């Protein structure tokens, strides 16, 4: 068994055959654009700021996405070597920018693990904590350190990637490497709105186990809805169609959009456990 999840065996014959018909992730990606009500999200964030609690757009999107995945667990499946696996955890990878003292901007990739006992506040706190620990020039996470070491030895990167790819293909890649890799994730998300850029449909990587890539774009007038006085945030989503059926994807997106329409549903632990204490929410002014 792979360290990141067991193989799914109780599949209909056609579903089990699809990964052999489309063996590569780039063969199997579909894309969709969802428009999120920017006015409603901003109003929700402002409401909690008045209560002294800090939230941001990416935390809102991730929380709604994860809550919908708990209702539709097949969205956390992945395909490797022609087989479908059920991931035994949920994590999100994303990129942040780090500005050096000479003005050059570098990127680093972070990964956050979520639990069913999380709510929108604990998810926001986890994201802020991992960003705070990695946003400065002198800070390096384990992924950065490993990459820096790998590229310090001529010829090593090509061999390491080749070895990791083949070990992963046969379920032999160690859990420690999977934890280091941003490409082994339930969802990869990028927030292009933060740099005032339009959304794109970003491919899912062939290396690793990413089945869904979400890209947040800068808000635009609601042309589709016909109300140009309101803004929506377009989200480009690319998904691996092999992990579930179109009907199951549709059910997921219905739930996802439902949580975004009523964000108050994300304020209590997703598994119904005891709500967190008020002091565990991220207060305004704390990054």
Language-model regions: role of each:
Residues 1-287:
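C-terminal catalytic/motor cores of large multi-domain enzyme assemblies
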